C-alpha cells in the first residue's frame, strides 16, 4: 500500500505526535540495549552461567523481538490512525504480537516451576538441571506460544466485509479466540505461577523454622554457660587446644605478650566474659576502613552484604589479644585461619579452611538462590501488573461486547503499558541482583578502562 488517497484527519496534533514518537523510540532503543546487555551478562559472566539462566536469555530475546518487530509498527499504526503496510503483514504482525507476549509469560511460568522443583526436590532435580534439559524446556515454551498464536493465520473465521475508508489492523474479534487466547496466554499461566510461588514460600518458611529449631536444639545441647576465670578464658569449653601463633608477633610490635590461651571456643554471649569479645573489630577489609564488629552482623543486614562477607571470609588481620583492639591490627600469619560467624563467634585453628570453605560455599549458593528467587518473583509481579489490564479489558469485550466495552483510549493505554514491560526486566535485574550489577558494570566499563578514556 502507498498510503491514503482521501482526506484524513490525524489522530494527534504535531506536538503530541512528536512527543509520543520520541518516547516510544526511546522505549525501543532502551529495550534492545537492556535485553542485549542481559544476554551478554549471562553468556559471559561466570556467576550467571548456571543452566537455568538460559531462561532469561530466551526471555530477553523475546523482548528484543517485541522491540524490533512489533512496537515500531504499532507506533506507526497509532500515530497515523490507519494501517499503512500490507494487509498480509497485518495478519503476521498480530500473530507475532501474540506469540512474543505468550512466550514471555510461559517463560515466566517455566521459570517458576524450575524454582519450585529446585526447592522441593533439590538433590534429584539439580542433577538433572543440565543445559540440554533447559533448552528442551525453552523449545517447548516457544511451541506452546506458537500453538496459541497461529490459529488466526490458519482459520480465518467468518469473513467480514472490508470496511470502507482507510485500512485498519485490529486484534481478532472472534469471541472464542479472545477467551481461549487470553486464558492460554495469560490467566492460566498466572494462576500456575501464583500457586507455585505460594508453595515455594511455604517450603522456605518451613525450612527456616526447622533451621531455627535445630539451632535452638544444638544450643541447649551445648555445655553450660562458660564461667570466667582469672585469666579471662572460659573454663567450660571442651574443645581441642589451639595455640595462637600471634603472641610473638604481638611482642615484636611492642605489645606485651598475652598469656597463652589453652582453650578456644565460641565467643560467649555473656557480657562479663572477656575472652574474644563479640565487638572485636578484628576483620577489617582492606581499602574500606573499619566496619562493624562481627556481633553486629545479622541476617537482616541484606543478602548483598552477606555474600560479600562470605566471599571475603579469609581475614587479613587479627589483634594479638583482646586488649589490643584499640591498637593497629596485626598481620595474621599464613599458618592459621579465622572463621567469623554472623553471631560474632570467632574460631581459630590451623586446618579449618577446608571444612569451613565448603560450608561458606554452600551458604553463598543458598544466598544467591534466595535472592534470585526473589528477583524472579518481582519480574513476575511486574509482568502481571503491566499485562493484566489489557487482558482483562480484552476478555471483557468478548464476554459482554455491548455493555462492558472499555473506551478505545483507555484500551490503547493498557495496550502500550503491556509493551513497556519488555524494557523493565533489565532494570529489575540491576536493582535487585548484585550478580547482574557486577556483570553489567564489567561489560560497560571494561572498554573504557582498557582504552584509558
UniProtKB/Swiss-Prot annotation:
Fetch the CDD domains from UniProt: 7tmA_alpha2B_AR
Using the UniProt record, give the first listed, main subcellular location: membrane
| Upper classification of the organism | Eukaryota, Metazoa, Chordata, Craniata, Vertebrata
Q: What is this protein called?
A: Alpha-2B adrenergic receptor
The record's subunit annotation is:
Interacts with RAB26. Interacts with PPP1R9B. Interacts with GGA1, GGA2 and GGA3.
**Topology, Cytoplasmic side:** 43-54, 114-135, 199-375, 433-453
How is this protein annotated for GO cellular component? cell surface; cytosol; intracellular membrane-bounded organelle; plasma membrane
Q: Which residues lie on this side of the membrane: Extracellular?
A: 1-17, 81-90, 159-174, 400-408
Q: Which SUPFAM superfamilies match?
A: Family A G protein-coupled receptor-like
Function as written in the Swiss-Prot or TrEMBL entry: Alpha-2 adrenergic receptors mediate the catecholamine-induced inhibition of adenylate cyclase through the action of G proteins.
Organism, per UniProt? Rattus norvegicus
Q: Which cysteines are joined by disulfide bonds?
A: 90-169
Amino acid at each position: 500500500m502507498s498510503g491514503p488517497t482521501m482526506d484524513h484527519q490525524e489522530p494527534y496534533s504535531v506536538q503530541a505526535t512528536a512527543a509520543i514518537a520520541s518516547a516510544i523510540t526511546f522505549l525501543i532503543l532502551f529495550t534492545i540495549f537492556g535485553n542485549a546487555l542481559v544476554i551478554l551478562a549471562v553468556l559471559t559472566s561466570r556467576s550467571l552461567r548456571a543452566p537455568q539462566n538460559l531462561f532469561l536469555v530466551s526471555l530477553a530475546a523475546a523482548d528484543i523481538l517485541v522491540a524490533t518487530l512489533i512496537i515500531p509498527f504499532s507506533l506507526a499504526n497509532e500515530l497515523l490512525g490507519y494501517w499503512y503496510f500490507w494487509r498480509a503483514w497485518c495478519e503476521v504482525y498480530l500473530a507475532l504480537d501474540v506469540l512474543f507476549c505468550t512466550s514471555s509469560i510461559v517463560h515466566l511460568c517455566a521459570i517458576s516451576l524450575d524454582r519450585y522443583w529446585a526447592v522441593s526436590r533439590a538433590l534429584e532435580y539439580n542433577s538433572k538441571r543440565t543445559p540440554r534439559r533447559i533448552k528442551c524446556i525453552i523449545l517447548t515454551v516457544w511451541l506452546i506460544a506458537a500453538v496459541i498464536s497461529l490459529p488466526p493465520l490458519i482459520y480465518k473465521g467468518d469473513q467480514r466485509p472490508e470496511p470502507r475508508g482507510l485500512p485498519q489492523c485490529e486484534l481478532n474479534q472472534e469471541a472464542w479466540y479472545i477467551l481461549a487466547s487470553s486464558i492460554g496466554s495469560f490467566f492460566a499461566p498466572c494462576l500456575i505461577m501464583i500457586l507455585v510461588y505460594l508453595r515455594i514460600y511455604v517450603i522456605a518458611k518451613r525450612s527456616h523454622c526447622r533451621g531455627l529449631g535445630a539451632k535452638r536444639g544444638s544450643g541447649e545441647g551445648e555445655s553450660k554457660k562458660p564461667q570466667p576465670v582469672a585469666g579471662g578464658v572460659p573454663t567450660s569449653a571442651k574443645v581441642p587446644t589451639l595455640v595462637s601463633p600471634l603472641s610473638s608477633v604481638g611482642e615484636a610490635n611492642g605489645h606485651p605478650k598475652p598469656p597463652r590461651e589453652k582453650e578456644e571456643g565460641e565467643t560467649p554471649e555473656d557480657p562479663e566474659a572477656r575472652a574474644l569479645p563479640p565487638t572485636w573489630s578484628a576483620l577489617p577489609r582492606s581499602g574500606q576502613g573499619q566496619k562493624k564488629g562481627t556481633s553486629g552482623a545479622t541476617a537482616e543486614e541484606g543478602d548483598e552484604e552477606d555474600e560479600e562477607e562470605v566471599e571475603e571470609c579469609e581475614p587479613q588481620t587479627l589483634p594479638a589479644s583482646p586488649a589490643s583492639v584499640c591498637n593497629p591490627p596485626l598481620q595474621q600469619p599464613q599458618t592459621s585461619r579465622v572463621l567469623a560467624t554472623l553471631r560474632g563467634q570467632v574460631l581459630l585453628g590451623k586446618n579449618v579452611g577446608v571444612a569451613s570453605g565448603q560450608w561458606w560455599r554452600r551458604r553463598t549458593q543458598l544466598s544467591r538462590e534466595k535472592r534470585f528467587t526473589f528477583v524472579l518473583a518481582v519480574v513476575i509481579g511486574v509482568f502481571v501488573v503491566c499485562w493484566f489490564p489489557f487482558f482483562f479489558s480484552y476478555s471483557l469485550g468478548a464476554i459482554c461486547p455491548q455493555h462492558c466495552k472499555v473506551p478505545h483510549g483507555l484500551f490503547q493505554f493498557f495496550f502500550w503499558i503491556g509493551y513497556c514491560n519488555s524494557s523493565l526486566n533489565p532494570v529489575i535485574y540491576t536493582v535487585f541482583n548484585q550478580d547482574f550489577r557486577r556483570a553489567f558494570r564489567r561489560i560497560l566499563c571494561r572498554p573504557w578502562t582498557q582504552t584509558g578514556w
